[in-house]
Regions:
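Active-site beta3 strand of CheY-like receiver
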Residues: 44-49
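Charged docking surfaces used in two-component/phosphorelay signaling
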Residues: 14-22
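Acidic catalytic/metal-coordinating carboxylates
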Residues: 32-35, 57-62
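The feature encodes the CheY-like receiver
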Residues: 13, 55
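Alpha4 helix (beta4-alpha4-beta5 surface) of REC/receiver domains from two-component response regulators
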Residues: 61, 81-98, 105, 109
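The short loop immediately C-terminal to the conserved phospho-acceptor aspartate in CheY-like receiver
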Residues: 9, 52-53
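Short hydrophobic/Thr-rich beta-strand motif most characteristic of the beta2 strand and flanking loop
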Residues: 24-31, 39
Length: 128
């Protein structure tokens, strides 16, 4: 499984990558939302973990663009500012939110949950 973490906090990116890699997941990361979009166009990722508040592009905007280009993308948003307005927006656009700080267990459960609820495109037996 491949996961892309997009968050403007490099230490947070490295921490999530370490947690995921400890479970045998191939994790890539970037601190730039636009670079994350570019990485997604060049490589296949099973799950995207995206911070909501980043410079240049909001995580919700990046998530919507990724979903448009990759309809079967599995996306989890993360935020230290997960208020009711954000939670309602994310529910409306269909992305789960993890509120920072969260435990490694909650991260892994969120990834497992989003994959368990996934629908594969017709004719797709394996990732690209």
């Amino acid at each position: 499984m491949r996961v892309l973490v997009v968050d403007d906090d490099e230490i947070f990116c490295r921490l999530l990558a370490e947690i995921l890699e400890g479970q045998g997941v191939e994790a890539a990361w970037t601190t730039d939302g636009l670079a994350g979009y570019e990485m997604a166009s060049r490589h296949h990722y099973d799950v995207f973990i995206i911070d909501v508040r980043m410079p240049l592009v909001l995580g919700t905007e990046l998530a919507e663009a990724l979903k448009k280009d990759h309809p079967f993308a599995k996306i989890i948003l993360v935020s230290a500012f997960a208020d009711e307005t954000l939670l309602n927006l994310c529910e409306r656009i269909g992305f789960p939110v993890l509120s920072k700080p969260f435990s490694a267990r909650h991260l892994l459960e969120a990834v497992e949950s989003i994959l368990a609820n996934s629908v594969k495109p017709e004719g797709s037996n394996s990732p690209r």
